[in-house]
């Protein structure tokens, strides 16, 4: 039994790591496809990930101690068992069961050949359940997928983990193909019994009103990451262009650090204006990050009427955030680096910056637990993020084309 428990323990240990790296693409796919993240759907898909990792580890573990694992040079067919139903003869050969004594049948659960066959059936039962319950596949598709999954497992073993090991360290067994496929079919058959205790997947999005949903900070944070990657790249490119142009005009190759800081600040101001104010005016309040996460900025008038965003709305929104808050913090950092202040002034400025960061941090933490998720620069500018509805996406794509 330990040979089966060990891979599952490894799967449980590595699952959080895999989940961490897959969370960002998972969220993006959910936002793009459904417009929001359904917690129950997330639970299903993460449980599917855990099952897939467990099944894969059960197939490949334990690994040989050495990649040079060939004891003798044999033909590939030496590592293949191609006679169907060999597991039956192996079970009958090893068993201590007396068929006329039903009480002796319990011995089967202690015998290697029977347990191995049973394991191969159980290995793919969850796959059949997922296929029918969540992916809503029919019997034929479940059969083909289960067979394909089993073939993938067997080829993984036959190729020595895709060539990492010189020789296969487990047999390619035709019985495993049959038993794994049977497991998938059993999973398909028992799904209605299990589904009676679970929500219907076709109803997960039934009562969802995207137009009334609040855009959360995780979603906005993902958009922020993509947008600021672009901002950083664009600012660097523009800074190099301006620096090169300045060097030509001044006929020098030595631009001082102070001049470079001015050029970087100038480039940042221009990029912010183009990316966050000019482009969203044309794209209906969308930047690349917002498009990826399926949100856009709208004007939220005091009368409660939502309107399309204008250039001046965007200027108020992003000038306050980037030129105001971020600009003030950058100015203090610039003074600290280039101001040549006395020691007491440096300490005072450091304290001011620390208080500034603390106040902002506390403010964002407080807003995190508030219902409306509206930040100060949005209140002042009368703007906010909303989820882009499917028809709005289609209209925007049609207009763009």
Segments from the language model and where they lie:
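Individual transmembrane alpha-helices with interfacial aromatic-anchor signatures
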Residues: 171-182
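Bulky hydrophobic segments
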Residues: 1-168, 185-289, 299-401
């Amino acid at each position: 039994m330990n040979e089966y428990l060990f891979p599952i323990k490894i799967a449980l240990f590595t699952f959080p790591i895999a989940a961490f790296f897959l969370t960002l693409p998972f969220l993006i796919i959910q936002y793009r496809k459904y417009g929001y993240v359904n917690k129950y759907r997330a639970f299903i898909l993460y449980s599917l990930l855990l099952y897939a990792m467990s099944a894969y580890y059960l197939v490949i573990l334990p690994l040989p101690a050495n990649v040079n694992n060939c004891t003798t040079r044999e033909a590939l067919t030496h590592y293949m068992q191609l006679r169907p139903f060999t597991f039956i003869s192996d079970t009958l050969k090893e068993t201590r069961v007396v068929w006329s004594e039903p009480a002796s049948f319990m011995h089967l659960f202690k015998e290697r050949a029977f347990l191995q066959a049973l394991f191969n059936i159980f290995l793919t039962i969850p796959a059949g359940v997922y296929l029918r319950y969540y992916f809503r596949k029919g019997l034929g598709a479940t059969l083909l997928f289960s067979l394909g999954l089993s073939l993938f497992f067997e080829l993984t073993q036959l190729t020595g983990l895709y060539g990492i090991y010189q020789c296969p360290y487990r047999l390619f067994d035709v019985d495993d193909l049959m038993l794994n496929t049977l497991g998938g079919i059993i999973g398909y058959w028992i799904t209605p019994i299990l589904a009676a205790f679970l929500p219907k997947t076709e109803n997960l999005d039934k009562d969802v009103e995207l137009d009334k949903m609040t855009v959360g900070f995780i979603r906005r944070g993902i958009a922020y990451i993509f947008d600021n990657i672009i901002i950083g790249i664009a600012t660097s490119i523009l800074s190099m262009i301006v620096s090169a142009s300045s060097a030509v005009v001044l006929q020098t190759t030595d631009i001082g650090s102070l001049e470079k800081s001015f050029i970087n600040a100038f480039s940042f101001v221009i990029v912010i204006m183009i990316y966050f104010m000019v482009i969203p005016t044309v794209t209906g309040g969308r930047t690349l990050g917002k498009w990826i996460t399926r949100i856009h900025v709208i004007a939220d008038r005091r009368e409660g009427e939502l309107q399309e965003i204008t250039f001046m709305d965007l200027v108020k929104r992003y000038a306050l955030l980037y030129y105001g808050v971020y600009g003030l913090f950058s100015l203090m950092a610039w003074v600290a680096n280039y101001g040549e202040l006395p020691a007491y002034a440096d300490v005072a400025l450091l304290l001011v910056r620390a208080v500034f960061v603390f106040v902002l941090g506390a403010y964002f933490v407080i807003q995190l637990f508030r219902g409306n998720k509206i930040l100060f620069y949005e209140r002042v500018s009368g703007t906010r993020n909303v989820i882009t509805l499917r028809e709005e996406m289609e209209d925007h794509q049609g207009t763009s084309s």
